[in-house]
Amino acid sequence: MINFTTNTYTLKREILNFSNKISRKLSKPNRKFTADMTYGMLASGSCLLTDVVDQLHEDSKKVNSVERLTRHLNKGIPNAALSSYLHTIRKWVPNEPVIHIDDSDIIKPDGRKFEALGLVRDGSKSTDTKNVYEKGYHVTEACVMTKSNHPVSIYSKIHSSKEKTFTSVNNVTFDAMERGKAMFGK
């Protein structure tokens, strides 16, 4: 019979080792946040903070743990963590990398109170002859293929034309291309 507890702890150790690699230059609270989010999302199979907190099994109240994670998320990704993450990924990629860049959309047709909710072309409903616009957000994602042909994200941004700092979708796409160029010098 397989010992599932041993497998669980082995998997948790591997997740925490990866988390420590990408957060070693961060402060202790940021390292804890990185470990908690990485483990919580993988263990729960969800990105909902309440589901993540359920997997952490902390002694504090659930609402307090969700607030702690929310505060860290609002700060954004520290540059040191991003740099470590991209450096780690670089080791997994072949000499001639394949980078996929995808400009997509997230549609929220019933959304009323979402922050910076703008109009986007609904790729699911639009055709060559007809464009359908819905409330939602633009999504730009860049992934690189590893040596074992697994896609790994190197750039991900959700953006809206209603944001004050928004310039154009093309600028965000070019940022994703620049990230790939800077990582691999191609």
Regions found by a protein language model. Give the residues of each.
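Basic, short loop/linker segments at the boundary and entry of helix-turn-helix/winged-helix-like folds
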Residues: L11-F33
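Active-site-proximal, Lys/Arg-enriched surface segment
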Residues: V66-K147
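Residues that form generic nucleotide/phosphate-binding pockets
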Residues: E14, F18-K21, G40, Q55, ...
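Long, contiguous hydrophobic alpha-helical segments, chiefly transmembrane helices and signal peptides
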Residues: T34, T38-M41, L49-V52, L69-H72, ...
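Short, positively charged, Gly/Tyr-enriched micro-motifs
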Residues: N3, K25-A80
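Electropositive, glycine- and tryptophan-enriched low-complexity nucleic-acid-binding patches
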Residues: G123-G185
